[in-house]
């Protein structure tokens, strides 16, 4: 499992999700507003908005918050946000991709650069690390939808490329351009997914020890704490032994 997925599981077990719920809702609302402003405010006619709302619901975002975010775009008074991608290296030469939605590129770039520098890493040029990742679709389901074999069969039938099942749930990957078609087929077989999104998947992972893993987790934590940052991806991996220590 790639390092960032492991990191998220650790933070979930430590209860950090509750501590950052308000910030998470703010990020989800921003994506909903941007999606609604970029197309029609009707999720039935706007695939990006439909996915944004679906992902917000998966995180138990209140219905009122979702509706307010959509209306904000329809009202025409929403800030203008740009989608920006930053790429760099963290401790141990680990590649990191940061996706942001910002109304001030200079502010966000300065903040992201500062976080990388303080962690002993460096912000690079766009394209400096993304070549070592693949842009893919990721569809997740809770374990309750079925066992690994059932989900694997549905995924193959839907045209997905891979399925991983662990204690957190089922993660299905597919080609970036196939997200809509595959997720629709899976919905017919398994019901509505928990999340459907495009992600950066590392082609290879870099093993790190406990010390470096802690530094990388802190880097990712600080990046995700920035209001403008929506997603962070990395290519580090830790052993089960180190994972157990970090989860303790």
From Swiss-Prot:
Superkingdom in the source lineage: Bacteria
Pfam families on file: TACO1_YebC_N, Transcrip_reg
GO molecular function: DNA binding
Swiss-Prot/TrEMBL GO biological process terms: regulation of DNA-templated transcription
Keyword Transcription regulation: yes
Localization: Cytoplasm
PANTHER family with a match to the protein in the record: TRANSCRIPTIONAL REGULATORY PROTEIN YEBC-RELATED, TRANSLATIONAL ACTIVATOR OF CYTOCHROME C OXIDASE 1
NCBIfam families: PRK00110.1 (NF001030), PRK12378.1 (NF009044), YebC/PmpR family DNA-binding transcriptional regulator (TIGR01033)
Annotated family: Belongs to the TACO1 family.
Protein name: Probable transcriptional regulatory protein Smed_2641
Protein species of origin: Sinorhizobium medicae (strain WSM419) (Ensifer medicae)
């Amino acid at each position: 499992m790639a390092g960032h997925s492991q990191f998220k599981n650790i933070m979930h077990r430590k209860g950090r999700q509750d501590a950052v719920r308000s910030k998470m809702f703010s990020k989800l609302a921003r994506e909903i507003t941007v999606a609604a402003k970029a197309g029609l405010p009707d999720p039935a006619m706007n695939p990006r908005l439909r996915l944004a709302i679906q992902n917000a619901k998966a995180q138990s975002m209140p219905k009122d918050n979702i509706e307010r975010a959509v209306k904000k775009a329809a009202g025409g008074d929403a800030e203008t946000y740009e989608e920006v991608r930053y790429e760099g290296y963290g401790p141990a030469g680990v590649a990191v991709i940061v996706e942001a939605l910002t109304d001030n590129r200079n502010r966000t770039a300065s903040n992201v650069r500062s976080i990388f520098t303080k962690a002993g890493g460096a912000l690079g040029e766009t394209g400096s690390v993304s070549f070592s990742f693949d842009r893919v679709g990721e569809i997740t389901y809770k374990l309750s939808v079925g066992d690994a074999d059932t989900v694997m069969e549905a995924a193959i039938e839907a045209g997905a490329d891979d399925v991983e099942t662990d204690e957190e749930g089922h993660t299905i990957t597919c080609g970036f351009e196939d997200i809509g078609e595959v997720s629709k087929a899976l919905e017919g077989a398994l019901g509505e997914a928990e999340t459907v999104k495009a992600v950066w998947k590392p082609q290879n992972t870099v093993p790190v020890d406990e010390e470096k893993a802690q530094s990388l987790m802190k880097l990712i934590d600080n990046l995700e704490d920035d209001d403008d940052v929506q997603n962070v991806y990395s290519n580090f991996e830790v052993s089960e032994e180190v994972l157990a220590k970090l989860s303790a």
